[in-house]
UniProtKB/Swiss-Prot annotation:
One of its GO terms (molecular function) is UTP:glucose-1-phosphate uridylyltransferase activity. It comes from Staphylococcus aureus (strain MRSA252). It catalyses: alpha-D-glucose 1-phosphate + UTP + H(+) = UDP-alpha-D-glucose + diphosphate. SUPFAM superfamilies: Nucleotide-diphospho-sugar transferases. GO terms for biological process: enterobacterial common antigen biosynthetic process; UDP-alpha-D-glucose metabolic process. Keywords: Carbohydrate metabolism, Nucleotidyltransferase, Transferase. PANTHER family: UTP--GLUCOSE-1-PHOSPHATE URIDYLYLTRANSFERASE. The gene is gtaB. This is UTP--glucose-1-phosphate uridylyltransferase. Disulfide bonds: none annotated. Signal peptide: none annotated. InterPro entries: GalU_uridylyltTrfase_bac/arc, NTP_transferase_dom, Nucleotide-diphossugar_trans. Its EC number is 2.7.7.9.
Length: 288
């Protein structure tokens, strides 16, 4: 069985929920404290043993490439000024993994974005990490899925429970059997209508997929939003070859919409020793 050493991170979206900030700046580069959100995702992949990452980009995404590239002039200035801690942080972002880029030529959905990286992946199993979800966990969320793949040899989809009122916002699984946190899946449903979801187990931005998924994506018809939906292709693959779901452990932060982004920033700031005390005082002074 081949080891999971490659990952895809889709980053071609327009970031419309954050306009006008994302008119010229990629949404993935918006910072939680002093790091862009996409760096948290790449750090998770690196901790899970991923060596090669391909980021699927679109127009106006050059800042992502620049961030993970070395900038010798900046490093020299930091070194000359004795700012060794900042220098280490700047260099760290360039050393996380081997990072490659491919452009998604059309905005045709997540499934289409994954297809854009087919040549890079080849005939290997791979991980997918979506940038809207930062997960804090002792064992990286995607590593938990990799462990299930290595045990079963099958594709594994990361899920977590959501309130029933929110199920229409996600891809949802209809579980067939349960073994601890692991599920065999009867059916995958992309964004079911309110009140029709078969469970409250939602697909949460982490996948380990076998290369066969590309064959299903190649023939996948447009689904929700007139886009090529990855969930629809996974559902078809599941009919032929069992796909598992795994309720991964960890605290998930939704940075794909404004309120979640603000909440995440506050929580991360409160975990930071350098600002916790003053921020706590400020929040109390608001008297909310």
């Amino acid at each position: 069985m081949k080891k999971i050493k490659k990952a895809i991170i889709p980053a071609a979206g327009l970031g419309t929920r954050f306009l006008p900030a994302t008119k010229a700046m990629p949404k993935e580069m918006l910072p939680i404290l002093d790091k862009p959100t996409i760096q948290y995702i790449i750090e998770e992949a690196a901790r899970a043993g991923i060596e090669d990452i391909i980021i699927v980009t679109g127009r106006h995404k050059r800042a992502i490439e620049d961030h993970f590239d070395s900038q010798k002039e900046l490093e020299m200035v930091l070194k000359e000024k004795g700012k060794s801690e900042l220098l280490e942080k700047v260099q760290y972002s360039t050393e996380l993994a081997n990072i490659f880029y491919v452009r998604q030529k059309e905005q045709k959905g997540l499934g289409h974005a994954i297809s854009s990286a087919r040549q890079f992946i080849g005939n290997e199993p791979f991980a997918v990490l979506l940038g809207d979800d930062i997960v804090e966990s002792e064992v990286p969320a995607v590593k938990q899925l990799i462990d299930v793949y290595e045990e079963t040899g099958h594709s594994v989809i990361g899920v977590q429970e959501v309130p029933e009122a929110d199920t229409h916002r996600y891809g949802i699984i209809d579980p067939l059997t349960k073994n601890g946190r692991q599920y065999e899946v009867k059916k995958f449903v992309e964004k079911p209508a309110q009140g029709t979801a078969p469970s409250n187990l939602a697909i949460m931005g982490r996948y380990v997929l076998t290369p066969e998924i590309f064959d299903y994506l190649k023939t996948q018809k447009e689904g929700a939003g007139n886009e090529i939906q990855l969930t629809d292709a996974i559902e078809r693959m599941n009919n032929d070859n069992q796909v598992y779901a795994y309720d991964f452990e960890g605290e998930r932060y939704d940075v794909g919409e404004k309120l979640g982004f603000v909440k995440t920033t506050i929580e991360y700031a409160l975990k930071d020793d350098s600002m916790r005390e003053e921020l706590t005082r400020f929040i109390k002074e608001l008297g909310l």
